[in-house]
């Protein structure tokens, strides 16, 4: 008998067939409980406080020295790690997308799967290992999230570029995000599913991916993003495992014009306009090179699939030395300029001054070289001083010349290099800070003085806030205004619940509910009546010489309504309210930027703008995760908002009470009542009615969002807590706490 057969452990904890295997469509509440204290080595650690004790200039000095400290185990191209570190920072921040605010550099996710093993991130494992001695030296005073971004900034500065600034404040997490939807493809570099196609194919990394099939995709010159290439929302990359576009062209087709369309869509979904996009590409490709020294079959598995002996590194390369001049990363072998470690405008000069012809890299990937052998010998080799090359370009580079919108922008930057430098500095700063939220979160000595529109600026707060007596007076006036509890609660929710924990945007501060585009959103139908009444109260109060912002008043109105509803249910006590919010102007509000915050569905108000293929309860879960809610908070808020009458348009769906406007646990008691039998009332199973089992009388009507709290085992267990005979007090306490949390999600000035 072998030793192995004697082992008492044939399987270990966490293995075997899981619930998700049996029921893949099951609501996944785990996304509400990520990054808990159990995963953190120091749950009480205050990163902002630690960062403020950092010797920032000493850190930058060490980073600058690292740039030219080439290591034998991973030699620096051209003797300078700057381009590698720019790519590292870019690929950390570049996962951000505006559709849901997820991705980005804000928590150091590049360290974890899947990002650490994306095909587009080959060799960035080495970049982070090069940084480890510096991270080790400065410890918890600098997070990986901040260090990755700062290193990219220092890399630019070390090569002669003047950056716009840097702000810290990105705290690390200690496990992979589970809430980010990266696509449904099951193979790396697959791209069919996100474009609604019927088949997924893949090639090895570095050799392109899908080859366009005219019968399925249409002729390349006739493709249109609104039709054949309509990228699934909220995705901002054309293939699984890429940051943006396929550099060889759409699906490996080397068509610069078609590539331009992909670039515009993907960069736009990362909040970049056409000028910013051109500046980022032209600025970023002023430095460094790509790597495709040999065939991709020389490259081993990614970090997550590599053996223990690799110690978290991946993509072991058996071609030649496997490093230096033998490096294989993207499979493309391109060096754009003769000054790859110094800022210049040569990228655009080469792009426009040469005519280009299609060729292939040693790995077989499509790329471009100057026609007629021009430019030969002008570009240095990255590792052999005895070799010289011609400049080369990617298909995505040529898009800047041949796309009819990008071309005049790129040509203007070619002729005005100072304007390119300014545009690149600003676009780079936006790239690496877009997911940081309001300026109250920014830390460090290099924060720019200039306020930028994409930062959703707010006026400075008046240090003299309203007093407790003022708050009591305003509450009385609000409750005497004739507005219902439901109207007040729904309006406060509409204002505060735009917050996204992903990119820290939205929320009640600023009172942008009264401004375009929020005032015109379908979800906010009816709030104009409430806002008009509150503005009248504000005007009367402010005429006395004191000042209250409408932002504060909107939240206070909801707070007063919750207090009244609790009192009417027989519970005493107050709901916490902390003033200090300000009112933004329309000039401080980028309509296009805020448009992505519009709720297309808000289960908390039983609202859907249209019919969607995604089930309503999954849209609710997504909203709850963006609001940073736990499963108990989600549950208690739904139950409370329903009985308060906060539904959109006064809908009766889910209002399982005969005393709306009273903060009772009726929603849970009546949902779990076994004398009621539920049946769908619509063919799509979106609405239901509950009938008395004996009489057949209709008692209640509800949506999928309502019924999931009795159907889903975990949510039902939570609902039972609040439906119990001793659950009333806990229900009110928990609702009040969750309500105040949502109302203050954007109050980083208090944290």
From Swiss-Prot:
Cofactor(s) in the UniProt record: heme b
Gene Ontology MF term list: catalase activity; heme binding; metal ion binding
GO biological process, alphabetically ordered: cellular response to hydrogen peroxide; hydrogen peroxide catabolic process
Chain sites annotated for binding heme b: 285
The name this protein goes by in its record: Catalase-peroxidase
Top class in the EC scheme: oxidoreductase
Tryptophyl-tyrosyl-methioninium (Tyr-Met) (with W-90), cross-linked positions: 244-270
Location in chain, cross-link Tryptophyl-tyrosyl-methioninium (Trp-Tyr) (with M-270): 90-244
HAMAP family: Catal_peroxid
InterPro entries membership: Catalase_peroxidase, Haem_peroxidase, Haem_peroxidase_sf, Peroxidases_AS, Peroxidases_heam-ligand_BS
Sequence ranges of Basic and acidic residues compositional bias: 214-227
Active site (record annotation): 91
UniProt site (Transition state stabilizer): 87
UniProt record similarity statement: Belongs to the peroxidase family. Peroxidase/catalase subfamily.
Post-translational changes noted in the entry: Formation of the three residue Trp-Tyr-Met cross-link is important for the catalase, but not the peroxidase activity of the enzyme.
Catalysed conversion reaction: H2O2 + AH2 = A + 2 H2O; 2 H2O2 = O2 + 2 H2O
PROSITE patterns: PEROXIDASE_1, PEROXIDASE_2, PEROXIDASE_4
Organism: Pseudomonas putida (strain ATCC 47054 / DSM 6125 / CFBP 8728 / NCIMB 11950 / KT2440)
Enzyme nomenclature, EC number: 1.11.1.21
């Amino acid at each position: 008998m072998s030793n192995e057969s004697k082992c008492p452990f044939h399987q270990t904890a966490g293995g075997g067939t899981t619930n998700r295997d049996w029921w893949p469509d099951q609501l996944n509440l785990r996304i509400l409980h990520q990054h808990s204290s159990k995963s953190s080595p120091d749950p009480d650690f205050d990163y902002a406080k630690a960062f403020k004790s950092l010797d920032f200039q000493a850190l930058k000095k060490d980073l600058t020295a690292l740039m030219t400290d080439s290591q034998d185990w991973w030699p620096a191209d051209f003797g300078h790690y700057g381009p590698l570190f720019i790519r590292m920072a870019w690929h950390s921040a570049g996962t951000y997308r505006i559709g849901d605010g997820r991705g980005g550099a804000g928590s150091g996710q590049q360290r974890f799967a899947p990002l650490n093993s994306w095909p587009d991130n080959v060799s960035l494992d080495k970049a982070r290992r090069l940084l480890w001695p510096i991270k080790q030296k400065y410890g918890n005073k600098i997070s990986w999230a901040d260090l990755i971004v700062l290193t990219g900034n220092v890399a630019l500065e070390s090569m002669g570029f003047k950056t716009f600034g840097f702000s810290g404040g990105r705290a690390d997490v200690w496990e992979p995000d589970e809430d980010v939807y990266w696509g449904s493809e099951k193979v790396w570099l697959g791209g069919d599913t996100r474009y609604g196609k019927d088949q997924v194919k893949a090639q090895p990394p570095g050799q392109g991916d899908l080859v366009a099939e005219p019968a399925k995709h249409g002729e390349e010159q006739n493709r249109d993003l609104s039709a054949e290439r309509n990228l699934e929302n909220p995705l901002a990359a054309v293939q699984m495992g890429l940051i943006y576009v396929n550099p060889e062209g759409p699906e490996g087709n080397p068509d610069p014009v078609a590539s331009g369309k992909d670039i515009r869509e993907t960069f736009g979904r990362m909040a970049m306009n056409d000028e910013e996009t051109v500046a980022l590409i032209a600025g970023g490709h002023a430095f460094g090179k790509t790597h495709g020294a040999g065939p991709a079959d020389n490259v081993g598995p990614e970090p997550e699939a590599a053996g223990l002996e690799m110690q978290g590194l991946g993509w072991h390369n058996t071609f030649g030395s496997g490093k230096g001049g033998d490096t294989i990363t993207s499979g493309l072998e391109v060096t754009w300029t003769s000054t790859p470690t110094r800022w210049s405008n040569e990228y655009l000069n080469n792009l426009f001054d040469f005519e280009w012809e299609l060729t292939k890299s040693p790995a077989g990937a499509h790329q471009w070289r100057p026609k007629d052998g021009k430019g030969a010998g002008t570009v240095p080799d990255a590792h052999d001083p005895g070799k010289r090359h011609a400049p080369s370009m990617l298909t995505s580079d040529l898009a800047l010349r041949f796309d009819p919108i990008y071309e005049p922008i790129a040509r203007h930057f070619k002729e005005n290099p100072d304007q390119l430098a300014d545009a690149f500095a600003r676009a780079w700063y936006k790239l690496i800070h877009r997911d940081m939220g309001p300026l109250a979160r920014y830390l460090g000595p290099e924060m720019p003085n200039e306020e930028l529109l994409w930062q959703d600026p707010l006026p400075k707060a008046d240090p003299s806030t309203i007093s407790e007596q003022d708050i009591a007076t305003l509450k009385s006036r609000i409750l005497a205004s004739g507005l219902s509890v439901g109207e007040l609660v729904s309006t406060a929710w509409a204002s505060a619940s735009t917050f996204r924990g992903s990119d820290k945007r939205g929320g009640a501060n600023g009172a942008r509910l009264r401004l375009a585009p929020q005032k015109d959103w379908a979800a906010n139908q009816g709030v104009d009546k409430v806002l008009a009444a509150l503005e009248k109260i504000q005007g009367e109060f402010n005429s006395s010489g004191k000042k209250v912002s409408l932002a504060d008043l909107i939240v206070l109105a909801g707070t007063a309504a919750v207090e009244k509803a609790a009192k009417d249910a027989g519970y005493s006590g107050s709901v916490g309210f902390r003033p200090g919010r300000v009112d933004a102007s329309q000039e401080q509000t980028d309509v296009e930027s805020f448009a992505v915050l519009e709720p297309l569905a808000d289960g908390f108000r039983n609202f859907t703008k249209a019919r969607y293929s995604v089930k309503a309860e999954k849209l609710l879960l997504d909203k709850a995760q963006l609001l940073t809610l736990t499963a108990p908070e989600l549950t208690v808020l739904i139950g409370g908002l329903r009985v308060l009458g906060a539904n959109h348009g006064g809908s009766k769906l889910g209002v399982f009470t005969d005393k709306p406007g009273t903060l009772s646990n009726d929603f849970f008691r009546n949902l779990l009542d076994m004398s009621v039998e539920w049946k769908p009332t619509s063919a799509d199973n979106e609405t239901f009615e509950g009938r008395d089992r004996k009489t057949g009388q209709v008692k209640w009507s509800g949506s999928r969002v309502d019924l999931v709290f009795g159907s889903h085992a975990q949510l039902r267990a939570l609902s039972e807590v609040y439906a119990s005979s001793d659950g009333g007090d806990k229900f009110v306490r928990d609702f009040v706490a969750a309500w105040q949390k949502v109302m203050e999600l954007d109050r980083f000035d208090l944290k």
